[in-house]
Every structure is written in structure tokens, then in C-alpha cells.
């Protein structure tokens, strides 16, 4: 599914901008990711090299929910679909697992988990995507739009 979510920030709208933003966040996220975020490590589909990307990662039990906001255009999603074994560093620790697309029957549970958690970092993130004052309801609506318009994944942790 191709994502339709647009932002007032042209930096976020470009593929290069997203990579640059992730690269800027990476050193901080490697030290201690904010609640609800993490560093996803994949294997490059063409090069076989290790690739790391900062992502919103919601851990619930032995599952972690992620969304490729830009849908199938997202490079890390293409890497995951080609080689589903991933490593994920979240606040609780570093885990390995197998990533797959969210199935229709588990979508309501995944949507609730993805949209439920709010941290301070979400308020900053909201200001990059939307104009206006960030409120919990507006942040959840933004996350729901990402989930509905993007490509949701679940990582089954080992």
C-alpha cells in the first residue's frame, strides 16, 4: 500500500530527508532509544551489508510493531521482505526476530498497540509532520494514519 501521509516539512517528504534524519538520530538511539522507538538492523537485499534505521517500534510481549510510513517505497521494508531476520534495539534491550507483514485478523490488536503509547518524543515528532499544537488525540490520529496508509509489520521476537 502506498502511503498518502504528507507533511508541511519538505525534508520529511523526501526519501533522502528520512535517511538523513535517521542518521542524525542513530547515535542517540543506540545509546538509549526513547520509549516507543528503536534501531532496526536489516540485511541489504542487494549488498548483503548490515543496515540500521531508526524506527517507531512498539513492543508488546514477544512482538514488536513497526510501520513503513512511506509504504513499499521504503528501503528498509524492501530489505526486510527480502531477508526477514532482523535485530531490533529498543529501550528494553536488543532482540532478534523474524519480521512479517501484519495479517488481517491481527490488525486491530496491532493498530491499538501502535497508537496507544505516547512519549515526550512524540510531541517533537508531531511538529515535524503536522502544523498546530500537538495533543494526545492528534498524535494518535497521526500514528493511525501512518498505520492505515503505510505498511505495518510485526517482528516475532526469539
Give the role of each language-model region.
Residues 40-41, 84-96:
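Short conserved beta-strand and strand-loop elements enriched in small hydrophobics
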Amino acid at each position: 500500500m502506498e502511503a498518502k501521509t504528507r507533511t508541511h516539512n519538505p525534508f520529511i517528504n523526501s526519501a533522502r530527508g528520512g535517511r538523513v534524519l535517521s542518521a542524525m538520530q542513530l547515535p542517540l538511539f543506540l545509546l538509549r532509544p526513547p520509549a516507543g522507538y528503536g534501531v532496526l538492523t536489516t540485511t541489504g537485499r542487494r549488498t548483503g551489508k548490515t543496515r540500521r534505521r531508526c524506527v517507531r517500534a512498539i513492543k508488546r510481549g514477544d512482538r514488536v510493531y513497526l510501520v513503513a510510513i512511506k509504504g513499499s517505497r521504503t528501503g528498509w521494508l524492501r530489505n526486510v521482505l527480502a531477508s526477514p531476520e532482523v535485530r531490533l534495539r529498543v529501550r528494553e534491550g536488543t532482540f532478534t526476530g523474524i519480521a512479517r507483514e501484519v495479517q488481517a485478523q491481527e490488525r486491530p490488536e496491532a493498530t491499538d498497540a501502535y497508537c496507544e503509547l505516547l512519549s515526550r518524543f512524540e510531541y517533537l515528532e508531531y511538529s515535524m509532520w503536522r502544523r498546530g499544537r500537538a495533543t494526545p488525540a492528534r498524535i494518535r490520529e497521526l500514528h493511525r494514519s501512518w498505520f492505515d496508509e503505510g505498511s505495518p509489520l510485526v517482528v516475532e521476537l526469539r
